Amino acid sequence: IIENKWISPLPELEIIKIEGWQPNAWYDQTDIPWVPPSPNIPDLKTAIIYPGMCLFEGTNISEGRGTPNPFKWIGAPWIDGKKLSQTLNNFKLPGVVFVPKSFTPIPIPGKSENPKFKNQKCHGIEVWITDRDKYRSIDVGVLTLYSIYNMYPNKLKIRETGLNRLWGSNSLYEKLIRGVTAQDILKY
């Protein structure tokens, strides 16, 4: 912002060092109170899950908005949550297990006025972090999208520009439509 002179006049900034800061500490290991960065990221666990599961914002899958657990719960009316959770658990991703979850997104003022599948029962998964130091959010999101793409090719709709914007390029979308293996989809 400053380097590109987006604001005028340019402010004079002063860097203030934080005493006792440990860069590899989790937020809840500090004495800093949690302030949600978004209405749909109410807690630290959601913030940890969000980077991977936000990919579903570029699809017709509910990312859990309109529920108490956005991004922790994902699904659609046509998903078999038991099969999806089994598929994902078979990948044996570190620090996470997946459990079947059914939920009904509803409007929540100030958070989600018109969630995907509003007032419709959705089935899918809940992401349970078992070890946040080993959990890999992007791998979880990519393999979940990969699994749904392969399980429901005629039901899953991907908004290509939306997914590409979230991913930063078209490489994930291209790999999905080329039908790469699970191992190759994780090469990013």
Residues covered by each model-derived region:
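Noncatalytic linker/hinge segments flanking ATPase motor cores
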Residues: 3, 56-61, 169-171
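Short gly/pro-enriched beta-turn/loop segments at secondary-structure junctions
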Residues: 8-10, 64-69, 120-122
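Conserved functional hotspot residues or short segments at active or partner-binding sites
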Residues: 75-187
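Conserved, well-structured core segments that form the ligand-binding/active-site neighborhood
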Residues: 1-19
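Glycine-rich, aromatic-lined ligand/substrate-binding cores of catalytic
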Residues: 20-98, 105
